[in-house]
């Protein structure tokens, strides 16, 4: 038996010993408090979920949020605009998918219906002027709190579990089924899956457009993930290279990959997201542990 198994067995024995203690009902509160703290600590340890997390709170216009208003566990991006006010905006993955080439026309229409106001059109126009999406847009975190007022207050988890405000429930990550990608030769063969967001580029009607994928793989090493993605996007990479040669552009890479976090294979569920009468098929990565990494580009 290795040290980890021995430690786990010792902890289980301690928990059972705590349950059998006869003095828990003693009215003298000091000893009872010690026992209660011990029980809570061991319960947290055994559950495998870290109590500490890294999160940030920001404000963004409510007009840029739609399903994010009613659903926690939505991936958010930080957008640096080219204007002085507002200088920084925060938009969701679903918002960016409304203009991604790898999303079907039907789903793009549904997303456009969700996000309907003049500000959305202006922000999308600014995003479309970027040479690369990542030049102005960067991964920020997963929503754990949304509070609406004159502006929306967002709390986004950058590392840790996506707890709600009371830390009673753990939420997952919700992504569109159309952009969900499993490039492994034998998907879901391991108990833990790593989640990445991938941005790639393609020439559409003589114009470069971005695509977004949420990738699920059993590989943690990002260099291996890049190799798998190179093989998966072999045709798209060839067409992109042809575009670079013919357009005399200064673009230098085909795509980028960045880790979002990890989750258990058994926690990957299919479902539907509903908002204002619109229903979209989604994948829910329940109990995801967010662990954002640095972006890695590839050609």
Swiss-Prot record:
GO molecular function per UniProt: DNA binding
Q: May I have one GO cellular component term?
A: viral capsid
Entry annotated with the keyword Nucleotide-binding:
no
Cited InterPro entries: Herpes_1 (IPR004999)
Coarse class of the protein's main subcellular location: virion
The cross-references to Pfam families, in alphabetical order and at most eight, read:
Herpes_VP19C (PF03327)
Task: List localization entries.
Answer: Virion; Host nucleus
Q: Give TM regions.
A: none
Q: Name one GO biological process term.
A: viral capsid assembly
Q: Which UniProt keywords apply?
A: Capsid protein, Host nucleus, Virion
Is Glycoprotein included in the keywords of this UniProt record? no
Family, according to the entry, reads as follows:
Belongs to the herpesviridae TRX1 protein family.
Note the subunit structure. Answer: Interacts with TRX2, MCP and capsid vertex component 2/CVC2.
* Function of the protein: Structural component of the T=16 icosahedral capsid. The capsid is composed of pentamers and hexamers of major capsid protein/MCP, which are linked together by heterotrimers called triplexes. These triplexes are formed by a single molecule of triplex protein 1/TRX1 and two copies of triplex protein 2/TRX2. Additionally, TRX1 is required for efficient transport of TRX2 to the nucleus, which is the site of capsid assembly.
Any idea what this protein is called? Triplex capsid protein 1
């Amino acid at each position: 038996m290795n040290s980890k198994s021995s430690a786990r067995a010792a902890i289980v024995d301690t928990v059972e010993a705590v349950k059998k203690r006869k003095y828990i009902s003693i009215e003298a509160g000091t000893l009872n408090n010690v026992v209660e703290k011990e029980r809570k600590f061991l319960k947290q340890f055994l559950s495998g979920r870290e109590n500490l997390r890294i999160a940030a709170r920001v404000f963004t216009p409510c007009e840029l949020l739609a399903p994010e208003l009613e659903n926690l566990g939505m991936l958010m991006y930080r957008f640096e605009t080219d204007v002085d006010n507002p200088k920084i905006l925060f938009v969701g993955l679903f918002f960016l998918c409304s203009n991604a080439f790898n999303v079907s026309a039907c789903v793009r229409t549904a997303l456009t219906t969700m996000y309907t106001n003049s500000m959305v059109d202006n922000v999308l126009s600014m995003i479309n002027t970027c040479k690369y999406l990542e030049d102005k847009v960067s991964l920020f975190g997963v929503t754990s709190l949304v509070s609406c007022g004159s502006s929306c207050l967002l709390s986004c988890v950058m590392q840790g579990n996506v707890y709600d405000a009371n830390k009673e429930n753990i939420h997952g990550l919700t992504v569109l089924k159309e952009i969900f990608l499993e490039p492994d030769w034998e998907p879901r063969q391991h108990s833990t899956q790593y989640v990445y967001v991938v941005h790639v580029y393609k020439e559409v009607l003589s114009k470069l457009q971005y695509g977004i994928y949420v990738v699920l793989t059993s590989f943690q090493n990002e260099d291996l993930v890049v190799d798998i993605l190179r093989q998966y996007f072999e045709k798209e990479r060839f067409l992109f290279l042809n575009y670079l040669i013919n357009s005399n552009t200064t673009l230098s890479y085909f795509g980028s990959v960045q880790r979002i976090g990890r989750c258990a294979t058994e926690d990957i569920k299919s479902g539907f997201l509903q908002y204002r009468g619109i229903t979209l098929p989604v994948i829910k990565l329940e109990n995801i542990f967010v662990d954002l990494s640095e972006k890695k580009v590839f050609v």
